[in-house]
């Protein structure tokens, strides 16, 4: 397993095992961790996690579990048995669901992955929340869900970098994982609440999820190295 000290998590957002491994083979596991999301995991199942771990990568399993407490807790346990470094669940599943996941991991005999809560997806703005019956600013909803996550004993949160300062102030013990990271000059794509890597760390983020600026670069290894150098 790598001794990765970098905050960078590269999103392996690909439909096939071959495409994901083609990128992973260009990356140094000492400079980044990798994220396996719904598309890749559904296509490849648990074998992709085993293969990536065999290449030295710590794996963030980004499946955003959301179900009744026992079902979600058993899914988190299955992720731990795969040897993932980090796993996440939706905070909107509620206090009992998150607490059940934490309790299950506390009883797990092997290395325990970080248990991270998903607050408000970075693609969602106020009008999107209104469409699902929440007449509230995204940042206020994030703070409400963060309080639940803290009470449940979660290790951290997925949040946008704009929300990081308020979250660090309110819950300094929670580790913050931030998607929607774009180096200066990159396209925003479908994520709205974005900052550059340096801005995100300065705002209080602990881990940075970066996808297309690395995966679609002409030279992914060079793109990763440039971001690492920017962060010092």
Swiss-Prot record:
<keyword id="KW-0210">Decarboxylase</keyword>
<feature type="binding site">
    <location>
        <position position="191"/>
    </location>
    <ligand>
        <name>substrate</name>
    </ligand>
</feature>
<dbReference type="InterPro" id="IPR013785">
    <property type="entry name" value="Aldolase_TIM"/>
</dbReference>
<dbReference type="InterPro" id="IPR014732">
    <property type="entry name" value="OMPdecase"/>
</dbReference>
<keyword id="KW-0665">Pyrimidine biosynthesis</keyword>
<feature type="binding site">
    <location>
        <begin position="62"/>
        <end position="71"/>
    </location>
    <ligand>
        <name>substrate</name>
    </ligand>
</feature>
<dbReference type="GO" id="GO:0044205">
    <property type="term" value="P:'de novo' UMP biosynthetic process"/>
</dbReference>
<dbReference type="Pfam" id="PF00215">
    <property type="entry name" value="OMPdecase"/>
</dbReference>
<comment type="function">
    <text>Catalyzes the decarboxylation of orotidine 5'-monophosphate (OMP) to uridine 5'-monophosphate (UMP).</text>
</comment>
<comment type="subunit">
    <text>Homodimer.</text>
</comment>
<feature type="binding site">
    <location>
        <position position="182"/>
    </location>
    <ligand>
        <name>substrate</name>
    </ligand>
</feature>
<dbReference type="GO" id="GO:0006207">
    <property type="term" value="P:'de novo' pyrimidine nucleobase biosynthetic process"/>
</dbReference>
<keyword id="KW-0456">Lyase</keyword>
<dbReference type="InterPro" id="IPR018089">
    <property type="entry name" value="OMPdecase_AS"/>
</dbReference>
<feature type="binding site">
    <location>
        <position position="35"/>
    </location>
    <ligand>
        <name>substrate</name>
    </ligand>
</feature>
<feature type="binding site">
    <location>
        <position position="13"/>
    </location>
    <ligand>
        <name>substrate</name>
    </ligand>
</feature>
<feature type="binding site">
    <location>
        <position position="211"/>
    </location>
    <ligand>
        <name>substrate</name>
    </ligand>
</feature>
<protein>
    <recommendedName>
        <fullName>Orotidine 5'-phosphate decarboxylase</fullName>
        <ecNumber>4.1.1.23</ecNumber>
    </recommendedName>
</protein>
<dbReference type="GO" id="GO:0004590">
    <property type="term" value="F:orotidine-5'-phosphate decarboxylase activity"/>
</dbReference>
<dbReference type="GO" id="GO:0005829">
    <property type="term" value="C:cytosol"/>
</dbReference>
<feature type="active site" description="Proton donor">
    <location>
        <position position="64"/>
    </location>
</feature>
<dbReference type="InterPro" id="IPR001754">
    <property type="entry name" value="OMPdeCOase_dom"/>
</dbReference>
<comment type="similarity">
    <text>Belongs to the OMP decarboxylase family. Type 1 subfamily.</text>
</comment>
<dbReference type="InterPro" id="IPR047596">
    <property type="entry name" value="OMPdecase_bac"/>
</dbReference>
<feature type="binding site">
    <location>
        <position position="212"/>
    </location>
    <ligand>
        <name>substrate</name>
    </ligand>
</feature>
<feature type="binding site">
    <location>
        <position position="122"/>
    </location>
    <ligand>
        <name>substrate</name>
    </ligand>
</feature>
<dbReference type="InterPro" id="IPR011060">
    <property type="entry name" value="RibuloseP-bd_barrel"/>
</dbReference>
<comment type="pathway">
    <text>Pyrimidine metabolism; UMP biosynthesis via de novo pathway; UMP from orotate: step 2/2.</text>
</comment>
């Amino acid at each position: 397993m790598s001794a990765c000290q970098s905050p960078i998590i590269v999103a392996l957002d690909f439909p096939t095992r071959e495409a994901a491994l083609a990128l992973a083979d260009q990356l140094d596991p000492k400079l980044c961790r990798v994220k396996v999301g719904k598309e890749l995991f559904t296509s490849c199942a648990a074998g992709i996690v085993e293969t990536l771990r065999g290449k030295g990568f710590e794996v963030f399993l980004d499946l955003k579990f959301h179900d009744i407490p026992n079902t979600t807790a058993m899914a988190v346990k299955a992720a731990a048995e795969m040897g993932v470094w980090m796993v996440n669940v939706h905070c909107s599943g509620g206090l009992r669901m998150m607490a059940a996941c934490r309790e299950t991991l506390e009883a797990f005999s092997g290395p325990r992955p970080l248990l991270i809560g998903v607050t408000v997806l970075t693609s969602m703005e106020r009008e999107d929340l209104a469409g699902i019956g929440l007449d509230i600013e995204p940042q206020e909803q994030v703070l409400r869900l963060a309080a639940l996550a803290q009470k449940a004993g979660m290790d951290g949160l997925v949040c946008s970098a704009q929300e990081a300062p308020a979250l660090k102030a309110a819950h300094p013990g929670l580790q913050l994982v931030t998607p929607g990271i774009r180096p200066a000059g990159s396209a925003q794509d479908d994520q709205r609440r974005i900052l550059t890597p340096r801005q995100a760390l300065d705002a209080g983020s602990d881990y940075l999820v970066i996808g297309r600026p690395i995966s679609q670069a002409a030279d992914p290894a060079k793109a990763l190295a440039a971001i690492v150098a920017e962060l010092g």
